[in-house]
């Protein structure tokens, strides 16, 4: 793409000149400033917020990343790094006065070390690809966001991603050992260590979840875990959200640590069942999915205890997965919930906050009241075990006033910042 493909007049910078300068650093084919070619980069998964990129740069090496960042730093040009664009908090939304740096070519799995139980990968490697590469050695990478088939490990580090199994196995910060990054001044930095308990300040915890504000991740070393010998999912359906909330607290208080403990409300249940036919009871007001893993006897005992608890606490249907296929089908419904909601609403606004487990029912009840107040549907799909909520506020951007009501319905995110709420006060270069 040539530097003069399209005049840039949206702001005060001469973007044709900047694109030409960047083409001296990166292959001209991968410095994009044509409007139609840059349009796919105007937003991430939170499509309600968009900004057309001035220039998109797709480097092929760490040296090129360093040179691009040095160039931008010297000219105070903001840089927004993009992984797969699956995020739901506008973290990859372009800055109106900056460029987009896409890590799409950093896709090499550099090393799988089964003896040390680590994987060393470039930042553009897909989350699920790490587990796929480790599977022949009986190992897996634990954090599993719903978008794991597409999201990248660099984006996971930026967002400190979790997933349905984070209750037992932790978030990205608990599973990353070392990160190679480039600062906004173009300097290479290594944070962390392959050792499980490295010396010095824990800068890795500072970096993980910093959403690109501290540098551009180019390489990540993660720890791998042995695949559990056995795993079963207990699916429990309730006719009342309060009962389901009480069940969550009771499971944890019994000393049971599930691999995953997820909850869905009726709107999410119906949408997911219609989408993937997981066998969910669509008449349920709330659905719990509780996975137990470990050795065969331990899993059998825990699954029986959880099943008995669910009946005791008022579930009207309880099923325990009997095969690996059935277990995966139960989870497929949960992990497909977000795209399933997309089939019943033109747009949705995903929020992300954490509350005490004991207040789940109270918060869900308040959401239903707000749903009536703002005349917008809300679907709830969330990590019940640690109280991490993901309410999806459904709206149609083509209907005047609905997006504004959705914004008023929502709130500032607590586990991930909203890029459009911070761009005005944070310097990226």
Q: What are these regions, as identified by a protein language model?
A:
Residues 108-264:
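FAD-binding subdomain of flavoenzyme oxidoreductases
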């Amino acid at each position: 793409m040539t530097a003069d493909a399209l005049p840039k007049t949206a702001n005060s910078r001469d973007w044709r000149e900047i694109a030409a300068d960047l083409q001296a650093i990166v292959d001209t084919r991968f410095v994009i400033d044509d409007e139609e070619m840059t349009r796919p980069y105007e937003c991430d998964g939170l499509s309600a917020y968009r900004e057309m990129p001035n220039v998109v740069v797709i480097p092929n090496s760490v040296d090129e990343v360093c040179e691009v960042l040095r160039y931008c730093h010297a000219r105070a040009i903001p840089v927004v790094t993009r992984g797969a664009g699956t995020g739901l908090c506008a973290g990859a939304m372009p800055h109106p006065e900056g460029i987009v740096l896409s890590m799409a070519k950093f896709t090499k799995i550099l090393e799988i070390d089964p003896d040390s139980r680590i994987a060393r990968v470039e930042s553009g490697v897909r989350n699920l690809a790490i587990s796929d590469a480790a599977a022949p050695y009986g190992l897996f990478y634990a954090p599993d966001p719903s978008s794991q088939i597409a999201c990248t490990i660099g984006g996971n580090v930026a967002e400190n991603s979790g997933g349905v199994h984070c209750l037992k196995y932790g978030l990205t910060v608990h599973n990353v050992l070392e990160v190679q990054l480039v600062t906004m001044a173009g300097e290479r930095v290594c944070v962390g260590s392959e050792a499980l308990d490295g010396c010095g300040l824990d800068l890795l915890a500072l970096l993980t979840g910093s959403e690109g504000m501290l540098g551009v991740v180019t390489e990540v070393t993660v720890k791998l875990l042995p695949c559990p010998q056995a795993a079963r999912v207990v699916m429990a359906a309730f006719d009342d959200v309060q009962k389901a909330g009480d069940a969550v607290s009771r499971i944890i208080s019994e000393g049971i640590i599930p691999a995953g403990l997820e909850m869905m409300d009726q709107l999410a249940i119906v949408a997911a069942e219609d989408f993937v036919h997981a066998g969910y009871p669509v008449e349920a007001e709330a659905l719990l999915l509780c996975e137990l893993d470990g050795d065969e006897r331990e899993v059998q005992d825990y699954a029986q205890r959880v099943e008995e608890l669910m009946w005791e606490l008022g579930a009207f249907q309880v099923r325990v997965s009997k095969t690996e296929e059935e277990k995966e089908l139960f989870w497929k419904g949960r992990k497909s919930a977000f795209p399933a909601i997309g089939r019943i609403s033109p747009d949705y606004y995903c929020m992300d906050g954490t509350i005490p487990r004991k207040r789940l029912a109270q918060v869900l009840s308040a959401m239903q009241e707000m749903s009536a107040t703002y005349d917008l549907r809300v679907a709830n799909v969330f990590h019940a075990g640690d109280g991490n909520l993901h309410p999806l506020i459904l709206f149609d951007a083509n209907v005047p006033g609905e997006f504004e009501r959705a914004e008023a319905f929502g709130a500032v995110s607590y586990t991930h910042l909203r890029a459009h709420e911070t761009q005005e006060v944070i310097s990226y270069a």
